């Protein structure tokens, strides 16, 4: 975002709003510190939070650079097809997590996703996933930190490196002090701040272009044309703005990438694990699915508005890259006061995203790497101290990875590439192991490793020009699909040749051998029909399907 062309004309009121937000965030972190007495308090909030808090934190943790800057950039670049990331690429997987997978996570009392893999398979599988997850989190933290720094650079004219360091220090302060509780309660606050900051962009932008009908007419006259207004039309081939076939959208995005992210990404699952009982844990991602349905109104729609109002948007470099769609609209549309709220909303979104990455990293590093392989029988105070040190380490590394993200003109493409490499193989291993009890520990390890290698090789071959796709996103969709297929094939080959675990060892870890049933909701005092995870989940999926009708 370099250059004075994006400098926002902030006044004292705008700076006051932003300053109050920073003070509040730090205050919440210090307030949460009083509740931290053990490592479980620091890493999992003592498993004591209500469903509405964990649900809002669940969706807020995802409202980072991927959601705000990335989805607005995609809206401008690919049009309405971007809604696939929400209605088929998020909601069904969130519902599946709540209904099917949370009973295994929460019921087995695991502290992390890698720990589940240790119990289900073996220590090599556990270590491989713990390391790959830790690497992924610091890379994605860098994306959020880079996006935060871009906004601060445009806001204050600071050098990019200085803005990155300042943003990192603020996130570091409230997580190190307040642990997961500090992150989660700030995420609830950040959810409302983010929405308050983005809604004016959509409303004022629509007024400027003549309402919804005016926006549609303008998109038809843009370089996207009529295709920019449809989600599914034209997906019988790759001749569409996204450059993706419906099979890649449904299988690559809707199944492998989506389920891989939402059901096995510990940065998200951690929010549900902090819930106070099984029912609250199961409802956490489902509650989050409802606001998720509506987020395109403040991300995709502004992207379309930027497409038709910002001349020259879509350059390869400079101020007019797609990543700048939202900041450009803020500069052009918002009056002072409202501008301060919008800037605060953006800053909140990037801090929420980075906090989720850092809190996930410190838990996995402490429990799944340090405790499991280096210092197994230390005091609880020792692990609490290690967790805080890991937090500092994650932020420092995130500062470095922020400069990697700076090399991508569309950070959404970068994030999807990371998901295809890290999440897709994990999901394949996870879901097959959960539903096929015969899958052996060695099959779990070799499946996860092989899937990761195939996804990485696909990406590198594409970047090296050896193989071609219509777009970076199509490569991510097919890379994820190939990784999943590789996991399935390797599992089928290795399993008959190696020894499985006994049913006693797998009780509570695989489908059909679990003591955890739907009846647990009544044991938790949450048996009311309107709190049923199944009912709430089915309604969310139906709404997602209905939302497609006007833009099919």
Question: What do these predicted ranges mean?
Answer:
Residues 2-552:
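Membrane-embedded helix-loop-helix hairpins and adjacent transmembrane boundary segments
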